Curated annotation (Swiss-Prot):
GO BP annotations listed: glial cell growth; glycine import across plasma membrane; multicellular organismal-level water homeostasis; neurotransmitter transport; perineurial glial growth; regulation of response to osmotic stress; response to water deprivation; sodium ion transmembrane transport
Keyword Transmembrane helix attached: yes
Subcellular location: Membrane
Lineage: Eukaryota, Metazoa, Ecdysozoa, Arthropoda, Hexapoda
Protein name: Sodium- and chloride-dependent GABA transporter ine
Function as written in the Swiss-Prot or TrEMBL entry: Plays a role in neuronal membrane excitation, important for normal response properties of the photoreceptor. Able to control excitability from either neurons or glia cells. Ine negatively regulates neuronal sodium channels. Controls neurotransmitter-mediated signaling pathways associated with the structure of the larval peripheral nerve, ine and eag control perineurial glial growth through partially redundant pathways. Isoform A and isoform B are both functional, although isoform A functions with greater efficiency. Has a role in osmolyte transport within the Malpighian tubule and hindgut.
Glycosylation sites: N476
Tissues expressed in: Expressed both maternally and zygotically. Developing embryos exhibit expression in the posterior hindgut, foregut, midgut, Malpighian tubules, anal plate, Garland cells, and a subset of cells in the central nervous system. Central nervous system expression is seen in segmentally repeating in cells flanking the midline of the ventral ganglion. Isoform A and isoform B are colocalized in both the nervous system and the fluid reabsorption system.
Species whose genome carries this gene: Drosophila melanogaster (Fruit fly)
Transmembrane segments: 346-366, 373-393, 418-438, 511-531, 539-559, 591-607, 618-638, 679-699, 723-743, 754-774, 799-819, 836-856
Disruption phenotype: Flies lacking this protein, in a wild-type background, display no observable behavioral defects. In a Shaker mutant background, flies lacking ine exhibit downturned wings and an indented thorax. Flies lacking ine exhibit increased excitability of the larval peripheral nerve by causing the defective re-uptake of the substrate neurotransmitter of the ine transporter and thus overstimulation by this neurotransmitter. Flies lacking ine increase the growth of the perineurial glial layer of the larval peripheral nerve.
Ranges in the topological domain labelled Extracellular: 439-510
GO cellular component: basolateral plasma membrane; membrane; plasma membrane
Length: 943
C-alpha cells in the first residue's frame, strides 16, 4: 500500500500518484475489493451490521455507493464518523479537500487525482478520485446525518471524528441539520437527507429531459477555520459520467450557519448545465451556501491536454453530436466539442469547397465576358484587398467562437446576426440547384462509357436538320447562322429535352431525377456523421481532381489552335478596365470561387483546434484556389482555341454561358481527341468530385446552423445528427425538383443569378461592417493573437477597416447602376417580366434576414431608451474572463458559471449573510471562497 499523501501535494502531482486514507476507526476493518461482490446489500466492514453496499440499476455499468453507519446505531439515529470504503466504479471525494484547495484554482483545473483498485478507505478530509469510464444512472446523494427529534430539529451528536492528515483539528461537535425521513433505493433502506432538491436537467440529445428528486445532505462538519469537512458519495440521475465528479464548495461557512428552523425553507436550488460545460451542477440553499459539482477529466488525451494545453481543456462528453446538447443560447459560449482529426482535413475541406465547379465553367466564362486577360487585373486586386482579408476574418471568427455563421455573428454583433442567417439562406438556395449539376455530371459520366459517344455526330434520333458537324482543319467552311453542334443538341434535346421557355415547364425528366437522387444519396452518406465522415471522403474527392486538371491541361495545350485561345486568355485589353462590369464580374467570381460570405468557411473553422494557425491556412487556400483557376483557364481557352480552329470561327463565338460551358463546349472538344472515351470519363469524374466537395460544404453549413440555432427543437423532433442531415437533404432535393423538368434550365439560370450573384457582395459588405466596425478590429486582432500568439498585420487590419468595405461598397453600387436582367444562351432567350419578380423574391429571402433580425434583436434588448437598446444589440455576447480578460482560459468556465449562479442565488433566495453574497457579486468567485469572517474582514478584495 502506498504512503499517505498530502492533499495539496496530490493536487499538484501526476495522475499516477495515489491517495491512501488513514486507517478506519477502531473496530472497523476495511474489506478488500475481492470481498465486494456485485449482488444486493452486504456488510462493508467486518462486524458492522448497519453498513450498506448499494448497487445501482445501471444497465451499462455497476455503480456502487457505500453508505456506512456507526456500529450499533440504526440509520438516522446517530452521527456517522466512520470511513467510506472506496470502490473503483464510484465517484467519491471530500468536501474538506476541496475546501483546502479553494485558493488553488489552477491545480483543480489542470490536475487529476486517481486511485488504483485496492482496499483504500476514504476518511473525511481526504481526496479520492477515479479514472474509470462508467455510466451512472441512479439518483442518489448520501451523506452522514445527525440525530433528529420528533419536530425535525437536529440534535448535536457528540461523536468524535478523527482529524484528517492535512486538515486542522475538527471541532468536537459536528454541524447539525434537520432530518426528515427514510427512503428506499434499489431495494435497500437508506437514511437520507432532510433536504429535497429538484434536479432539473437541461442536457442534450443523449439525456432526455428529466425532473428527478434527489435526496441530499450536507455533511455538517467544519474545522476551526470554517472549512467544510466530511465524506461524500454521489451519483447523478441520467448523466453519462465517463469521468469522476468532484464537489467544490463555493462558500465556506461555519457550522452554525447550517441550522434550519423552518422545514419549508429547506430547499436546495439546483441548475445543471450542459455536459459540454464541464457537466457542472450549481447547488445553493436558502442560507447562501452553494456547491458546484464538476467532472474531472482523467482520460489519457484529457490529461495530456491539461499538462500541455494547446487548446482549452475538453469540456464534456466526446461525442459526434455533443453540440446538440445545448440547452439555450448561453451554451453557444462553449467551444464546439468535435474537431478535425488533423490539420489536413480542414485544409482539404476548405480547398475542396473553394475549388469547385465555379472554377471550371464560371471563371472562363467571366474571363470571356470581361475581355480576356484584362479580367485578371481586377480579379487579383479584389483578391488581395477583399477576398483574402475576408477569408482570414471568417476563419478567425469561426475558430474563436466555435459556432456556425449564425451563432458566430450573433455573439460578435447581435444586431447583425441576420447577416449570418442570410449566408445560410444563400447556401440553402444554392444547394437546391447545385446538386443538379452533379446530376448532369453523373448522367454524362455513365454515358461516356459507350463505345461511341452520342455527342460526336448528327446521326441520332434527337438531332435536327440544324445539326452541323464542325469541319476538320484545312477545310474553309464556316458554320451556318442557325447551326447547332452535336454536343449542343445532345445536351438540350436529349438530356434536358428543353422546352420553349420558363412559361412552358413541361414534364419531369425521370433520367435526371434518378441522377439527382444518386447525387443526394452520395451527399447524405458522406455528411451523415458530420465532419468525421465527410473529411475521410475528401481525402480522395479533394485531391484526385487536381491530378485530372493537370492531365487535361497538358493535353489541351498540345491541341491545334490552343495558342490562339491562350493568346485571348492572357492578352489584356486595358481599355476594358473602365468598364464597371469587369470589376463586378471579378468581385462576383472572387466570392464564388473562394466560397466566402456563404458561411461554409466559418462553419469549417468552428471545428478547428483553438490555437490553429489561421493565417497559414488562409494563404494556402487562396494560393491553391488562384493556381487552380489559372490552370483551368489554360485548359478552357486551349480547348476553345481548338474549337475555334475546327469551326473556322473566332474564340468569342464558341464559348457558352452557364452549365453549357462544361456540358456543350468541353464534350465537343474531347470528342475530337484520341481515346475520347478515356478523356470524357476522366473529365466528368472530375466534375463529379468537384461538385460533391462543394455540396458537402453547403449541406454542412446548413446542418451546423440549424443545430446551433435550434438545439431544443432539434432534440425534441429530430434527435440525432443523421436525422438532421437527412431532413436537410430531403428538403433541398424537393426544392431542386423544378430544375429537372423540361423547362428547368431556365429556372436554374434564374436561381443562379438572383440567389447568389446579386446578393453576395451586399452580404460581404454587411459582414465586414459587423465584425470590423461594430465588434471592432482591435478586438478581433486581440482574439487572433490569443489563439495564434501573433496579431494580424497592419495590412489585414487596414483592409478590414477601410479598404475592403470601401471597395465592396463601390462595386455593389456599380452593380446596381449597371444592372442587366439575366438571359439564357447568350441572349437568345429573354425571360418574361414575372420571372424577374420571382428572381427578386429569391434574392429577398436572404436580404430581408439582415434588417428583420436587427429589428427582432432590438425589440428583445433591454434598455429604457432607443440608444440604450441600440448599444445593447451592438454589445458582443462573448464572455471575457474577469481575471485575464480572455475568452478561453483556465479561469473562464468556473469563473463564469460560479459568478452567474451567485447572481441567480441573490435573486431567488435570500442568504443568511447578505454581505458575503454582495462581496461575491463584486469580486466574483474569490470572495465566495472565503468564510464569513474572512469576507467581513475584507476578503480577497481587500475591502
Amino acid at each position: 500500500m502506498a504512503e499517505n499523501k498530502d492533499v495539496s501535494q496530490v493536487l499538484n502531482t501526476t495522475p499516477d500518484q495515489v491517495v491512501i486514507n488513514r486507517a478506519p476507526p477502531t473496530g472497523l476493518a476495511p474489506l478488500r475489493h475481492s470481498q465486494l461482490s456485485d449482488s444486493g446489500a452486504e456488510s462493508c466492514y467486518e462486524g458492522d451490521e448497519q453498513a450498506r453496499l448499494i448497487r445501482s440499476s445501471s444497465s451499462r455499468a455497476h455503480k456502487f455507493i457505500i453508505i456506512p453507519a456507526t456500529p450499533g446505531t440504526p440509520p438516522g439515529s446517530g452521527a456517522v464518523a466512520g470511513p467510506l470504503p472506496f470502490r473503483q466504479t464510484s465517484s467519491t471525494t471530500s468536501l474538506a479537500a476541496m475546501a483546502a484547495a479553494l485558493h488553488k484554482q489552477s491545480p483543480l483545473r489542470h490536475t487529476s487525482v486517481r486511485t488504483r483498485p485496492s482496499s483504500e478507505v476514504l476518511q473525511p478530509g481526504q481526496v479520492l478520485a477515479n479514472q474509470p469510464t462508467a455510466a451512472v444512472s441512479t439518483s442518489t446523494v448520501t451523506f452522514t446525518i445527525d440525530d433528529c427529534n420528533e419536530e425535525g430539529d437536529a440534535i448535536p451528536a457528540a461523536a468524535s471524528v478523527p482529524a484528517p492528515v492535512t486538515m486542522p483539528a475538527i471541532s468536537p461537535t459536528p454541524a447539525t441539520l434537520t432530518c426528515t425521513t427514510t427512503t428506499t433505493m434499489a431495494g435497500d433502506s437508506v437514511a437520507v437527507s432532510p433536504l429535497s432538491m429538484e434536479l432539473k436537467s437541461r442536457l442534450g440529445s443523449h439525456h432526455s429531459s428529466m425532473r428527478s428528486v434527489v435526496s441530499g445532505y450536507l455533511p455538517g462538519l467544519s474545522d476551526s477555520s470554517g472549512n467544510l469537512v466530511g465524506g461524500v458519495s454521489m451519483a447523478t440521475s441520467g448523466l453519462q459520467a465517463p469521468n469522476p465528479l468532484y464537489m467544490q464548495p463555493q462558500a465556506s461557512l461555519s457550522g452554525s450557519s447550517y441550522h434550519f428552523h423552518e422545514l419549508a425553507g429547506n430547499q436546495i436550488y439546483s441548475d445543471v448545465t450542459s455536459v459540454r460545460s464541464l457537466a457542472s451542477i450549481g447547488i445553493g440553499s436558502t442560507d447562501g451556501r452553494k456547491l458546484v459539482i464538476r467532472r474531472v477529466p482523467t482520460t489519457a488525451n484529457e490529461l495530456f491536454d491539461m499538462v500541455n494545453p494547446q487548446t482549452p481543456p475538453p469540456l464534456g462528453v466526446d461525442d459526434d453530436d455533443s453540440y446538440l446538447d445545448m440547452s439555450d443560447e448561453t451554451a453557444q459560449l462553449k467551444p464546439r466539442q468535435q474537431h478535425w482529426a488533423n490539420k489536413m482535413q480542414f485544409v482539404l475541406a476548405c480547398i475542396g469547397y473553394s475549388v469547385g465547379l465555379g472554377n471550371v465553367w464560371r471563371f472562363p466564362y467571366m474571363c470571356y465576358k470581361s475581355g480576356g486577360g484584362v479580367f485578371l487585373v481586377p480579379y487579383c486586386i479584389i483578391l488581395f484587398i477583399c477576398s483574402i482579408p475576408l477569408l482570414f476574418m471568417e476563419l478567425s471568427v469561426g475558430q474563436y467562437t466555435g459556432r456556425g455563421p449564425i451563432g458566430a455573428l450573433g455573439q460578435l454583433c447581435p444586431l447583425f446576426k441576420g447577416a449570418g442567417l442570410a449566408s445560410v439562406v444563400v447556401s440553402f438556395l444554392m444547394s437546391t440547384y447545385y446538386s443538379v449539376i452533379i446530376g448532369y455530371s453523373i448522367y454524362y459520366f455513365f454515358t461516356s462509357f459507350k463505345t461511341e459517344m452520342p455527342w460526336i455526330d448528327c446521326n441520332n434520333r434527337w438531332n435536327t436538320p440544324d445539326c452541323w458537324v464542325p469541319q476538320r482543319k484545312g477545310i474553309n467552311a464556316s458554320a451556318p447562322d442557325t447551326s447547332r453542334t452535336p454536343s449542343e443538341e445532345f445536351f438540350e434535346n436529349k438530356v434536358l429535352q428543353i422546352s420553349g421557355g420558363l412559361e412552358y415547364p413541361g414534364m419531369m425528366r425521370w433520367e435526371l431525377f434518378a441522377c439527382l437522387i444518386c447525387a443526394w444519396l452520395m451527399v447524405y452518406f458522406a455528411t451523415w456523421k458530420s465532419i468525421k465522415s465527410s473529411a475521410k471522403v475528401r481525402y480522395f474527392t479533394a485531391t484526385f481532381p487536381f491530378v485530372l486538371i493537370i492531365i487535361l491541361m497538358v493535353r489541351a495545350v498540345t491541341l491545334d489552335g490552343a495558342a490562339e485561345g491562350l493568346r485571348f486568355f492572357f492578352r489584356p485589353k486595358w481599355s476594358e478596365l473602365k468598364n464597371a462590369n469587369v470589376w463586378i464580374n471579378a468581385a462576383s467570381q472572387n466570392f464564388n470561387s473562394l466560397g466566402i460570405t456563404f458561411g461554409s468557411m466559418i462553419s469549417f473553422a468552428s471545428y478547428n483546434k483553438y490555437n490553429n494557425n489561421i493565417l497559414r491556412d488562409t494563404v494556402a487556400v487562396s494560393a491553391v484556389n488562384m493556381i487552380t483557376s489559372l490552370l483551368v483557364g489554360i485548359f478552357a481557352f486551349s480547348t476553345l482555341g481548338n474549337l475555334a480552329l475546327e469551326q473556322n470561327t473566332n474564340v468569342r463565338d464558341v464559348i457558352g454561358d452557364g452549365p453549357g460551358m462544361i456540358f456543350v463546349v468541353y464534350p465537343q472538344a474531347m470528342a475530337k481527341m484520341p481515346y475520347a472515351q478515356l478523356w470524357a470519363v476522366m473529365f466528368f469524374f472530375m466534375l463529379l468530385c468537384l461538385g460533391l466537395n462543394s455540396q458537402f460544404a453547403i449541406v454542412e453549413v446548413v446542418v451546423t446552423s440549424i443545430q446551433d440555432g435550434f438545439p431544443r427543437w432539434i432534440k425534441r423532433h429530430l434527435g440525432y445528427h443523421e436525422i438532421v442531415v437527412l431532413f436537410v437533404c430531403v428538403i433541398s432535393c424537393l426544392f431542386g425538383m423544378p430544375n429537372i423538368i423540361q423547362g428547368g434550365i431556365y429556372y436554374f439560370q434564374l436561381m443562379d443569378h438572383y440567389a447568389a450573384s446579386v446578393t453576395i457582395m451586399f452580404l460581404a459588405f454587411c459582414q465586414m461592417i459587423a465584425i470590423a466596425w461594430f465588434y471592432g478590429t482591435g478586438r478581433l486582432s486581440k482574439n487572433v493573437k490569443q489563439m495564434t500568439g501573433k496579431a494580424p498585420s497592419f495590412y489585414l487590419r487596414s483592409c478590414w477597416l477601410v479598404l475592403g468595405p470601401c471597395l465592396l461598397f463601390a462595386i455593389w453600387v456599380l452593380s446596381l447602376i449597371n444592372y442587366h436582367e439575366p438571359t439564357y444562351h447568350n441572349g437568345r432567350y429573354t425571360y418574361p417580366d414575372w420571372a424577374y419578380g420571382i428572381g427578386w423574391m429569391f434574392a429577398s429571402f436572404s436580404l430581408i434576414c439582415i434588417p428583420g433580425y436587427a429589428v427582432i434583436n432590438f425589440l428583445r434588448s433591454s434598455g429604457d431608451t432607443f440608444w440604450e437598446r441600440i448599444r445593447n444589440t451592438l454589445r458582443p455576447n462573448i464572455y471575457e474572463c474577469k481575471i485575464c480578460g480572455e475568452h478561453h482560459c483556465e479561469h473562464d468556465y468556473p469563473e463564469q458559471e460560479q459568478f452567474m449562479l451567485a447572481q441567480e442565488m441573490a435573486t431567488v433566495y435570500k442568504p443568511t449573510n447578505p454581505h458575503l453574497l454582495n462581496l461575491g457579486q463584486k469580486c466574483g468567485y474569490n470572495a465566495m471562497q472565503a468564510s464569513p469572517s474572512h469576507a467581513e474582514a475584507g476578503g480577497p478584495c481587500g475591502q
